[in-house]
Amino acid sequence: MFTMPRGVVRLVGALAFAAFLVEGALLDWSALFVTGSLGFAVAQGGIGYALFSVAMTAGRLTGDQVVKRLGGVRVLLWGGVLVAAGFALLLLAPAGWAALGGFVAVGLGAANLVPALFSAAGRQRAMPEALAVASITTMEYAGILLGPALIGFVADASSLRAAFAMLGALMLLFPLLRNRVPTAENA
């Protein structure tokens, strides 16, 4: 059952939307970026998403230890910074193979953002926990569904590189808003 998010749940849901927007955009557009912008052969088009996925999986599997060591606020800070830096590497690296490291950085940085946001859903007091989780989940899946279309719209109006730059800039919301998200350090 979907309930309109209230209070801090709106912020947490908006950040989850942004995180899943990036995941959806990479799922649908990374192969075109790898072949069109980085100059790889069509047969190698999937390498960017593969690197992103492996890095995200490794990050999620070690996420509990990362959160215990850094805390939720720092996970949001450094996760967002690492994703933005990954997009910068994708866009600015002088060679295609070096740019692929950007996909790894995006995967590692994004890996624990959404899990940290779900933890925040359990710490907030604006609405019942189950309804907060339902609202956040709905918002994040809207991001994964709308993300590819939004990237296509931006790419058509300008370029895929500009769309990827927009994604990197969007992920800077995590470090900027990290102290407003309920974590163990600030709840």
Regions found by a protein language model. Give the residues of each.
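Paired small-residue
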Residues: 86, 97-105
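Helix-to-loop junctions at the C-terminal end of transmembrane segments
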Residues: 59-72, 155-156
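Pair of pore-lining "gating" transmembrane helices in MFS-fold secondary transporters
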Residues: 6-22, 104-108
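Small-residue hotspots at the loop-to-helix junctions and early N-terminal turns
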Residues: 42-50, 130, 134
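Short amphipathic helix-loop junctions that connect adjacent transmembrane helices
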Residues: 28-44
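Structural signature of the two symmetry-related core transmembrane helices
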Residues: 74-89
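A late C-terminal transmembrane helix in Major Facilitator Superfamily
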Residues: 127-158
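Intracellular juxtamembrane helix-capping segments at the cytosolic ends
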Residues: 112-125
